[in-house]
Amino acid sequence: MTIRLEQPTDYREVENLTRESFWNVYRPGCTEHFVLHHYRTSPDFIPALDLVMEEDGRVMGHVMFSKAELLADGGRRVPSWTFGPISIHPDYKRQGYGLRLLQYALQKARQMGVGFICMEGNIEFYKHAGFGLASKLHIHYHAEPEDAVVPYFLAQELIPGWLHHNGVTEATYCPPRGYFVADQNPEAFEAYEATFPKKEKAFQEGQLPQFCQSCGMPLTRVADCGTNADGSTSFDYCQYCYKDGHFLQDCTMDQMIMHCAQFVSEVNKGLPQPITREEYIGQMKMFFPHLKRWRQEQ
């Protein structure tokens, strides 16, 4: 097993590897391969930390790193870093290769002066590489309330004392825009996806919660979903917002929020403690700007 820098001749193989690794894991289908495809030309991309793992001449693992930012007190922007996607071919998963690749990459990043990393992932895996809840370091996730303990938002000081040395006692992490390229360019993503062999999207146990990217309704089964122009299932939007490739409501984000507010009594049925209509509106005003439909308007 060897680890080396990715070369241009590896690009398509690595993108296919990434697609195979992530398909239906965190959501129906995946977009990580498209993120990688575009990221290599981003100013945030770090070529020296773009690594592949080989076994007998076959590329079976890959990880890339990116520049990022923390928004600290007074709006001060502090450079930081993140990584991902990290991919291991399904044939090699659960054999320790992912951890070996990540530990190698983190050591190389540390040697390059990378001092602090935020990322999103499963703590049960990433704790073995030194990651813990970012909230314990008073680093907040941009899409969650500041007092929330976000179980998938993780961080690590690769260089001890880096936060203190940079005057960071509390900050908010904003993921680089390059990670949202599929949402911002849905037609380009669909055209790119069509260059790969067709695979079926599906809801599976263990995926992250999925929400309608227009109204925020939870999506847990195909029957909840809308339809695309060709009649296929849209895993992005619910049946009440999207049909045959068109939105059923011609409205602004604020109008959608007020429309959804009338259903607060239904929302409260699934909550341990009920919230008021005003509280629900406040939560939606924080959440909706991060939904695909409305993020395109930001």
Language model features with spans:
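Active-site rim helix/loop that mediates acceptor-substrate recognition in acyltransferases
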Residues: 15, 22-64, 69
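A short beta-loop-alpha structural element at the N-terminal edge
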Residues: 2-14
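Conserved active-site alpha-helix within GNAT-family acetyltransferase domains
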Residues: 111-114, 121-147
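Short linker/helix segments within small regulatory modules
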Residues: 225-235
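A short, internal acetyl-CoA/4′-phosphopantetheine-binding micro-motif in the GNAT/acyltransferase core
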Residues: 85-93
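Short cysteine-rich clusters marking metal-coordination/redox-active sites
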Residues: 212-215, 238
